[in-house]
Amino acid sequence: MFSLLLISTLVSATCVAATAPDVRVLAAAVDAHYNHLKTLQAEFTELYRGGGMERSESGTLWLKKPGKMRWEYRSPTEKVFVSDGRDAWFYVPADRQARKTAAKKLEDVRSPLAFLLGKTKLEKELAGLSLAPDVSPIQADDVVLRGIPKALRDWINQILLEVAPDHRIVRILIDQVDGSSTEYRFTEQKENVPVTDSRFKFQPPPGTETVEGGLEQ
């Protein structure tokens, strides 16, 4: 009886190991997927949790290599975050104020997404890259990866990446050292769509106050 139980346990463990994806192979497949992209358009939902509060926002995201991104928030408040790779702007029409900073100085929670904009290598960017079997994916067929961004470890504890079977990243969860977290969910992804450089330029509307410095939301 004990022998049968032991054999059954070993067979089960072997099956689990056989079905679990290889982290290096999966990471390389994700790298290859994003390295061939020139542009990406997606709908996003941003979920923030921290300081006893929760906030949910949504809109449309455009990315273009090298280093360009535009986030257009529609709900619950209209606002824009845009970077042409040199300058970054954060603008809330209702406030009539635009904040500007150099993109290279940007310490924004969106900055971990920058690896989607250039030559990516997850194993190089994320220390301790591994599977996260303790984290439930949104879709059963997805796989969740865990890692610590080497360049941002002073303010980020870990990043979780949910990867779909076609190697698209459909969710990014960022846990910060202050106990807060920001989650991005991406749907309706469109790859290599025409996007002009003008979409990543920002000109403050007349009557808008411009503030140089951080881009706090």
Where are these regions (language model features)?
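Bacterial N-terminal signal peptides
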Residues: 1-13
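Flexible, processing/modification-adjacent segments and terminal tails
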Residues: 19-48, 54-55, 82, 92-156, ...
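Short loop/turn positions at the edges of beta-strands in beta-sheet-rich folds
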Residues: 36, 63-65, 75, 166, ...
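Short hydrophobic/aromatic-rich beta-strand segments that constitute the beta-sheet cores
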Residues: 44, 69-73, 88-91, 147, ...
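Short beta-strands and strand-coil junctions in structured, solvent-facing domains, enriched
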Residues: 50-51, 70, 77-80, 90, ...
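An acidic-aromatic
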Residues: 60-112, 182
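Gly/Pro-enriched, hydrophobic low-complexity segments
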Residues: 124-214
